[in-house]
Regions:
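Active-site metal-coordination segments of metallo-dependent hydrolases
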Residues: 48-51, 148-149, 208-211
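Short, flexible loop segments at the rims of nucleotide/cofactor-binding pockets, characterized by
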Residues: 93-100, 144, 163-169, 203-205, ...
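Non-catalytic C-terminal accessory region of glycerolipid acyltransferases
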Residues: 62, 70-73, 109-112, 134, ...
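A conditional alpha-helix N-cap/helix-loop micro-motif detector
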Residues: 97-101, 122, 148, 167-171, ...
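Catalytic core of membrane glycerolipid acyltransferases/transacylases, capturing the structured
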Residues: 113-171, 196-199, 232
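Hydrophobic alpha-helical segments typical of transmembrane helices
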Residues: 18, 30, 52-55, 154-155, ...
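Membrane-anchoring hydrophobic helices of lipid-metabolizing enzymes
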Residues: 2-119, 163
């Protein structure tokens, strides 16, 4: 069984390498558009798109079938574009004019002070550390390890082009994050996916197991949590906006405060997802049936 899994992982990695080579043969605008259109055509036909449809029904029940299908097609195009752009990440690092930063003063205010930036898998989320490094050079990012050993090693090396400081999700990663924050570093976290050992928070009116790390680190150690949103603008151009730090009225009960804080983060995510639902990753198994 292990051998078959290893073979499958190796074949998957070969496809990724071939796609990477192809994307690097041409400029980022061309490959982003091509892979985006290919994903738009093929993606909706995959079985996993049923989950995206179900998630849309749960989160935004007012949408009719036609609108849901339109969002799913657009979502796949964005995912294709994001993948192609990741293979050409050096271009996004070099061509700074492609990323317009709003709320730069918030970055300046928190520079070298230890801050947690939170967002979700929206538009091209990989550009977040690139934008932060425009002002604050000590930036780290949290990542979820892939089951595919080969792909995981490749992703870590590829992300080193963006930041040397990478932290795995989980208890060991949290310790590393805390030490990094103590040294004045900034950490970017995507907190929109299900985390089984998180807290049961509200997300689009449903119970969703959510990472409590940002809330916990902020409430226990005083590190600010700054939300941000990324928007795709005209192909391979982006706008990233930073907002005021999240604050709550403390109750004196740490568990209650962590939940309230996490709910506030989720409310922010709801707003930016609702603004451009076609740019969010609807394929994730976000809502556990056991809790809804």
């Amino acid at each position: 069984m292990f051998i078959f899994k290893l073979i499958r992982y190796a074949m998957e990695m070969q496809l990724i390498v071939l796609l990477s080579i192809y994307c690097k043969l041409f400029n980022i605008d061309k490959t982003s558009k091509q892979i985006g259109l290919l994903s738009r055509k093929l993606g909706p036909k995959l079985g996993i798109s049923k989950r995206a449809n179900q998630n849309l029904l749960k989160a935004i029940p007012t949408l009719n079938k036609r609108k849901r299908l339109e969002i799913i097609r657009d979502m796949w195009e964005n995912l294709g574009r994001t993948s192609a752009e990741f293979f050409n990440i050096k271009t996004l690092i070099k061509e700074k004019s492609r990323i317009n930063i709003k709320g730069r003063e918030i970055l300046e205010e928190n520079k070298n002070n230890g801050v947690i930036y939170v967002s979700g898998h929206i538009a091209n989320w990989e550009i977040i550390p690139i934008a932060i490094k425009e002002v604050d050079h000590l930036v780290g990012a949290v990542f979820r390890e892939s089951n595919n050993y080969f792909f995981n090693k490749w992703m870590i090396q590829q992300r080193k082009l963006i930041t040397e400081h990478q932290f795995p999700k989980g208890p060991s990663g949290t310790k590393e994050i805390l030490n990094f924050l103590k040294d004045g570093g900034s950490v970017a976290m995507l907190v929109d996916q299900k985390l089984s050992n998180g807290v049961k928070a509200n997300f689009f009116g449903l119970n969703a197991m959510t990472a409590s790390t940002p809330a916990s680190l902020s409430l226990k150690y005083g590190y600010p949590v700054v939300p941000l949103k990324v928007k795709r603008k005209n192909g391979v151009n982006f706008e990233i906006e930073f907002f005021d730090k999240i604050e709550i009225d403390k109750t004196g009960n740490i568990d209650t405060d962590i939940l309230n804080f996490t709910n506030k983060i989720n409310l922010f995510l709801e707003k930016i997802i609702s603004d451009k639902p076609e740019e969010w990753f609807w394929l994730h198994n976000r809502w556990d049936k056991r809790f809804n």
